[in-house]
């Protein structure tokens, strides 16, 4: 079954996860999500497959997040998803998913759960 990977080629974990997929002959669609960010509905679908909330895939250490000075207790899930769509650098990476499930490739070995 083909999988999709939200990939950032500048991220070592993302590169390692993609390499694992290729090594195991997995047909994968690579989305350079910084250039082609997922829509709010796509993020919601991925979150459902991950069984996580938006704050759990949020990269709070990114400088742009700190500049927003947002309190996670005071922002709604929809607002957080919109923020990630507008600023995709805030989305944890890599995320590998298919029609049924998803994993975050941190550590890259998590990617093997998609095989």
Go through the PLM ranges and name each one.
Residues 1-24, 28-33:
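Local sequence-structure signature of Cys/Sec-based thiol-disulfide redox active-site neighborhoods
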Residues 35-115:
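Thiol/selenol-based redox catalytic cores and closely related redox-interacting motifs
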